[in-house]
């Protein structure tokens, strides 16, 4: 559970859950904020992106007349005030995203524009096909002022954005800015990211909970797992590249000298050629042993799926926890738990047990399908929206 007001100091670093109070910075970052439906007759100077619930699962977007809003496919929940509404679609960085993410779905957005103020609800409703039990997702709002760039990582991280002449979203294939500053292969960010610059509002989502980390100055540094970074900002792409250094947490292989003179050959070897060959052979096996040990520790002790990035300030970092969901609909977990599968007698054969498990699965599916999964939204006169489960009305 994310608290809407957290501002904790750790050493000289401000770590927060993206407090709803706007900070006096160039780019305001908000993850969670109590949001109420705005009065549609009220004049709005700019589009507003706000989070409705405490868990950051749904966002409210208030849109000016004649301003297009692009929402990711399957993430549109509802639209309020349908006067002269126009719906179309937009491909965002199609070719670059197709090459980089190997998916065209990350580029497909619904384009919405109306002649009056619109109130739109959006949520990360898309599903990933790689893992059957993916992590829960939370939303975050980026209010860009045009003075800093944001790098957002992940193919499904951008949920919605307002389409204006100032906001620009790019998906570079070749790291031009980073290649100018990188003197080694360790000074680089993950390649799969999109660049946000200009002025406007962008709705992003991350796995699990989303946290904000404020690095105060250049002496303020932090190590971040590459899998957990959602977004990072900076004055420019060159500034972002200069602030990141890749670090793999594994033990380097022990140094083995190039010379074989340190290896003493057995006394029975008199020939100098054989002594030299013996020394080179021993040296080869030492290097091989060191390499095998290094690869073992790197793969099985420290892991190869991710690496750490040392990031220095001043800048803002968005971190995602990637916590896994333990859904009530996990049928296999319920069936294998105590009491759902009865122990068979010694004389029971495997066929009867298989039929029994199949019947338990079918009954559990029917039970889950009959559970109420609808929610009732009540809009009061002051514009406040309350969500209640239908189970409370039965």
From Swiss-Prot:
Knockout mutant characteristics: Increases frequency of mitochondrial genome loss.
UniProt keywords, alphabetically: Mitochondrion, Transit peptide
Compartment(s) where it occurs, according to its Swiss-Prot or TrEMBL record: Mitochondrion
Cellular component terms per the entry's GO annotation: mitochondrial inner membrane; mitochondrion
InterPro entries: AIM24, AIM24_sf
Family statement: Belongs to the AIM24 family.
Misc note: Present with 2290 molecules/cell in log phase SD medium.
Protein's name in the database: Altered inheritance of mitochondria protein 24, mitochondrial
Native species: Saccharomyces cerevisiae (strain ATCC 204508 / S288c) (Baker's yeast)
């Amino acid at each position: 559970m994310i608290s809407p007001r957290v501002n904790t100091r750790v050493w000289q670093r401000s770590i927060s859950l993206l407090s709803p109070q706007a900070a006096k910075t160039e780019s305001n970052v908000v993850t969670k904020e109590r949001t109420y439906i705005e009065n549609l007759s009220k004049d709005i100077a700019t589009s507003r992106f706000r989070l409705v619930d405490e868990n950051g699962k749904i966002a409210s977007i208030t849109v000016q007349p004649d301003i297009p809003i692009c929402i990711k496919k399957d993430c549109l929940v509802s639209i309020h005030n349908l006067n002269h509404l126009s719906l179309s679609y937009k491909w965002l960085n199609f070719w670059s995203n197709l090459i980089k993410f190997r998916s065209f779905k990350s580029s497909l957005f619904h384009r919405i524009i109306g002649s009056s103020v619109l109130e739109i609800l959006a949520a990360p409703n898309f599903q990933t096909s790689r893992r059957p039990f993916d992590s829960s997702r939370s939303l975050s709002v980026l209010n860009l002022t045009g003075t800093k760039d944001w790098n957002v990582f992940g193919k499904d991280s951008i949920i919605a954005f307002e389409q204006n002449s100032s906001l620009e979203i790019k998906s570079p294939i070749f790291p031009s800015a980073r290649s100018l500053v990188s003197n080694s292969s360790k000074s680089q960010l993950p390649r799969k990211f999109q660049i946000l610059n200009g002025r406007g509002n962008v709705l992003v989502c991350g796995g699990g909970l989303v946290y904000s980390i404020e690095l105060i100055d250049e002496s303020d540094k932090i190590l971040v797992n590459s899998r957990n970074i959602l977004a990072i900002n900076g004055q420019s792409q060159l500034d972002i590249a200069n602030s990141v250094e890749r670090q793999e947490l594994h033990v380097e292989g022990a140094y083995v000298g190039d010379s074989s003179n340190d290896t003493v050959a057995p006394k029975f070897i008199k020939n100098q050629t054989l002594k030299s060959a013996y020394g080179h052979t021993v040296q080869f096996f030492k290097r091989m042993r060191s390499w095998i040990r290094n690869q073992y520790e790197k793969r099985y002790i420290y892991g190869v799926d991710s690496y750490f990035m040392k990031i220095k300030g001043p800048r803002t970092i968005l971190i995602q926890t990637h916590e896994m969901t333990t859904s009530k609909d996990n049928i296999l977990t319920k069936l294998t738990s105590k009491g759902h599968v009865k122990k068979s007698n010694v004389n029971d054969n495997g066929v009867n047990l298989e039929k029994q498990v199949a019947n338990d699965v079918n009954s559990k599916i029917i039970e889950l399908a009959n559970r109420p999964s609808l929610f009732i939204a009540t809009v009061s006169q002051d514009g406040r929206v309350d969500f209640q489960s239908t189970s409370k009305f039965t």
